[in-house]
Amino acid sequence: QSAIIFVQQLGRGLRKLQGKDFLTVIDFIGNYQNNFLIPVALFGDNSYNKDNLRKIVSGGSQGIFGNSTVDFDRISKDQIYKAINETSFSQLKFLYEQYQNMQAKLGRTPKLMDFEAMDAISPLRFCPPTNQVKSYLEFRCKKEKTEPSELGITEKHLQSLRFFTQLLPRGLRPQELYLIKACINGNHSLDSIKSEAQKNSNCILDMRSWSSAISILQNGFLKVAEKAAFGNISYVKLGNNGLSPTDDFKALLENQCYKSELEDILSVGLAEYKKQFLRSKGKTQAGNLVVNSKYSRKDACRLLNWKNNEESTIYGYKMDYDTNTCPIFITYDKDTENISGSTNYQDRFINEETFEWFSRNKRTTSSEELQGLINQATSKTRTPLFVKKSDGEGTDFYYLGDLNTISAENSKIEDKGKQLDIVKFNFHMSTPIDENLLNYLDTKPTGNIQSDIVNPA
C-alpha cells in the first residue's frame, strides 16, 4: 500500500554475515494490484510518469546508484507493467494524498512549481487533475472545500485557466509560453520575444510556427465546442506597437489570484520545456517534435502548424495541403478481434531503417491523397511517423522521426472474401528506430500481460 513501507519491510531483520561480500534479498510479490509502487520504492522516482516507470523497470540496476543491484523475473516485470498500464494516477484520492504530503512538507498550500522543485510527483499529473476537475485551482478548492468565487474567480477566469492548463504545462514548444510571458511582463516587442525563444530552442522557429501560436492565442485552431468550453477568449493582438494583451485578457489579469495561477502554470511549462531542451539536443526535428517523445494527434496538428485541430478526422493518416505535411499514426498490435479485415493493415518495421506501410483500402497509386507521398522527391511532403504498441498505452504515440518514400505499389487486402485495392509503401526512416523499442514493438504480448516496455532515453 506504500512505497515507504515496502522499502522498510524489504529484507527486514536480515544482516550480511561477517566475511561475506553481499546479501541477497529474495522478495515474492503478492500484491499485484499495487506493484506499480515497486519502481517508485526501489528507484526513488516519485514523478508517477508511466513512461519513466516502465523505463526504470526495464533498465533494472542501471537506475540504482552504488553497489546494489536489482533483478525482476519475467512474470514480475509483466505484472508490474500491467499494473502501471491499468492504474490511473489521476484519481482524486491519489492526488489528494500527494497534495497533502507536499502541504505537510511546506507548511503552506503548494503551488504546481513546488512539485517540480521538490522532485515530487510530476505537476503534470494535476494538469488537468481529472476530466471533471479541469484546473489546479479547482482541484485545491475541491480539496479545501472552498468555492473559487470566494477568491473573486468567475466562470470566465476558470474557463481561461482550463485553456492554459491544457496548452502550456507540458512545454511542447516555446512560442505560446514566451508570448504569454511577454503579455504578463509588459514586453511588446515581437522581435525580442522571438529572439529569446530561439536562444532556447533546438530547432528553427519559423514564421509559420509563430503564426500558428498566435492563432491559438487568438481563439483559433480549436474546434467550435472547445472554444465555447474555454470561453471564446482571444488573448493577444498585434499592432503598430507590437504584441499586446487584449482587453479581455487585461481584465482577467486584474484578478491577482487568477494572475498567480496563470504564472504558476506558465512556470511549469517553461521548466518542462527547458528539461526537454536540455535532453533533446540532436533529436529535435522541425516543429519541436522530439524523436522518441510521445504526442497525441492533437499535439501533432498543433506542432505541424495546422490551421485547425483535425484530431478526430486523422485516423491513420491525413494530408494537410496548407503545410504540405502528412503524419502517419500506427497502432502496432491491432485488436484483431474487434476490427474488420479491411482495416487490419500489416504495417511493420522490416529493419531499423525501413518501414512497410499500407494506405487506406480502396486506394491506388492514382489516388489524389497519396500523390504527395508517392512523389515525395519532388513534392517535399513531410511525413512524420507516430507509433504506439497497443490501445492500452493510451492516446499518445512515440514520434519516431520523418519518413522518406522508397517505393509505392498497388496491392490488395482481403475483407470478407473480397479483394480491396490498397497501396503498399516502403519508407526509409530518417532516424533509425532504437533497437530496444523495435524489439518491444515486435514482441507479441502474452495473454493480457504486456511485454517488456522500453522508452529510449
Give the residues covered by each predicted segment.
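Conserved segment of the helicase C-terminal RecA-like domain
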Residues: S2-F43
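A short, structural micro-pattern
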Residues: G19-F22, S379, F397, Q419-D421
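Structured loops at beta-to-helix junctions and adjacent beta-edge loops in soluble globular domains
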Residues: F28-N31, T331-D333, K388, H428-S430
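Long, largely alpha-helical accessory region at the distal end of helicase-like NTP-driven motors
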Residues: I38-Y178, V454-A457
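Short, surface-exposed beta-strand/loop "edge" segments at domain boundaries and coil↔beta transitions
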Residues: K105-R108, N185-K194, D333-N344, G392-T395, ...
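C-terminal accessory/interaction regions of large nucleic acid-associated machines
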Residues: S149-E311, Y321-C326, N344-Y345, F349-N351
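Acidic, glycine-rich low-complexity segments with interspersed aromatic residues
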Residues: S160, A182, G287-D396
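Compact mixed alphabeta submodule
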Residues: S390-P456
